[in-house]
Regions:
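Ubiquitin-like/PB1-type beta-grasp interaction modules and other compact soluble beta-rich domains
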Residues: 21-211
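Beta-rich interaction/scaffold domains
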Residues: 1-33
Length: 212
């Protein structure tokens, strides 16, 4: 009998715990919440400065956080989304508190290197798009709306790769559009999946003895 009473008490405590968790979850979803998506696209470290005016050398873009949905309050900014996404992914970055991200550290499975402004060349750095367009302000000053699609991406050579700066004389678009939005060519998969695919390619040796 004593054992049954103890089991019943434990069960009641468990039910109460589950109930409190459910109420907490309901409180967290308040009317007016918005749902947005976020994707983070980095790049491999360059072995030379990227300058698409001179040659076609371009480090590969790699997704660091695949497209993920996030629930935020209706007055949330890109900063709120960015810090939530980076934090949940366990990544580190520098500068967001000052409204300009200078550095993001790659996922550990990719080596954890620091990818910063100018790492891959004089016109390289971090940018972001909302619904496909680069906003004209910092991440703390852009409010999000329900359904917004945010892509935070590295750019190796903004003069050749950013398609939406035609009217800004300080950032003239160069080239013929060949390299526009190159970061979007990265597969929308986790960095772990990218590494697995890369290892698979390395291990797949063709009949002629070369790596395919």
């Amino acid at each position: 009998t004593a054992q049954r009473d103890m089991n019943a008490a434990v069960s009641c405590e468990r039910v109460e715990e589950i109930f409190q968790k459910a109420m907490s979850d309901l409180d967290a979803v308040k009317p007016g919440d918005i749902e947005v998506t976020f994707r983070l696209i980095g790049a491999l470290e360059a072995t030379q400065d990227v300058d698409l005016t001179k040659d076609s050398y371009l480090p590969e873009y790699v997704t660091w956080i695949p497209t993920t949905s996030y629930d935020l309050q209706e007055d949330a900014t890109v900063y709120d989304l960015y810090t939530k996404a980076i934090g949940e992914a366990g990544l580190r970055s520098i500068g967001e508190e000052n409204d300009y991200v200078r550095t993001i550290y790659a996922p550990s499975c990719l080596g954890g290197y620091a990818l910063s402004e100018f790492t891959n060349g004089a016109r390289s750095g971090w940018m972001y798009t909302v619904n496909g367009t680069h906003p004209d302000r910092g991440l703390k000053n852009w409010k999000l709306k329900d359904g917004d699609v945010v892509v935070w991406h590295y750019i190796n050579d903004y003069a050749h790769e950013a398609a939406d700066w035609f009217d800004d004389p300080d950032y003239p678009a160069l080239g013929d559009g060949t390299y526009y939005n190159g970061w979007l060519r990265a597969a929308d998969i986790s960095p772990e999946q990218y590494v697995q695919q890369l290892l698979g390619k390395i291990l797949k040796v063709g009949k002629n003895g070369t790596v395919e």
